From Swiss-Prot:
Pfam families: Ribosomal_L12, Ribosomal_L12_N. It comes from the Bacteria. Forms part of the ribosomal stalk which helps the ribosome interact with GTP-bound translation factors. Is thus essential for accurate translation. GO terms for molecular function: mRNA binding; structural constituent of ribosome. Belongs to the bacterial ribosomal protein bL12 family. GO terms for biological process: translation. Disulfide bonds: none annotated. The keyword Chaperone does not apply. One of its GO terms (cellular component) is cytosolic large ribosomal subunit. The keyword Oxidoreductase does not apply. The gene is rplL. This is Large ribosomal subunit protein bL12. InterPro entries: Ribosomal_bL12 (IPR000206), Ribosomal_bL12_C (IPR013823), Ribosomal_bL12_C/ClpS-like (IPR014719), Ribosomal_bL12_oligo (IPR008932), Ribosomal_bL12_oligo_N_sf (IPR036235).
Length: 124
């Protein structure tokens, strides 16, 4: 079963060029008709293109607060613009989303600030 999963993972991660080469190998070495192999290749290459589109919107998730909870609450309040009660609610309910739909750069900057204060952060 593990071998099949590894094989499936390799297929999903093929580039368009590799799919084209695979199509040619299936045609020449195994006699699989071009129409059959090209429709398979088209389906695979469409999936590959969709999977490899770069993500532009990220969510910042507070996973844990460490030992300095008060500093994290203050920092969450400052970085999100929330009130003290709302910021404390997020910290108390970790894991919880801090900011959603932000850029990669903003997410990395906020993550660095929060981790320096002792928080455990995840970017999704």
């Amino acid at each position: 079963m593990a071998d099949l999963k590894a094989f499936a993972e390799q297929l999903v991660n093929l580039t368009i060029k590799e799919v084209s080469e695979l199509t040619e190998i299936l045609k020449t070495e195994y006699g699989i008709e071009l129409a059959t192999s090209s429709s398979v290749a088209t389906g695979v290459s469409t999936s590959v293109v969709e999977v490899r589109e770069e993500k532009t919107s990220f969510d910042l998730i507070l996973k844990g607060v460490g030992t300095n909870k008060l500093a994290i609450v203050k920092l969450v309040k400052e970085l999100t613009g929330l009130g003290l009660k709302e910021a404390k609610g997020i910290v108390d309910n970790a894991p919880a989303p801090l900011k959603e739909g932000i850029t990669r750069n903003e997410a990395e900057t906020l993550k660095k600030s929060l981790e320096e204060a002792g928080a455990e952060i995840d970017i999704r």
